[in-house]
Amino acid sequence: RSPHAHRKVLARAHHGGAKVAEQAIAACKSTAAMWAATSFEERARIFLKAADLLAGPYRAVINAATMLGQSKTVYQAEIDAACELADFLRFNVSYAARLAEQPLSAPGMHNALELRP
């Protein structure tokens, strides 16, 4: 229901039981190895594409959903949903890339980091 108009139904949701939860977990586990084998560049491309979609063609949709679901004004929704979500996606790609860089180290020292999704 809408937080500002309690009689207005925004959506109806199905509540799955234990079997549905187990199926969802199994589906996630079955794709874990594939995601782990995906290169950083490809993962980054996926997240940056999502950011571009949120900042572009889906901007009005995400803002409208935020306005309805959280009783935000158009200005609040723009800041809290479209802009911030796209920024988070882009920032996290940038930050993940920085994790692969070598930190400042003494001569002859090399640091390695293995990230496991």
What name fits each language-model region?
Residues 6-100:
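Glycine-rich loop-to-alpha-helix module at the N-terminal edge of alpha/beta enzyme cores
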Residues 98-117:
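Conserved small-residue-rich beta-alpha loop and adjacent elements
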Residues 1-5:
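Glycine-rich phosphate/pyrophosphate-binding loop
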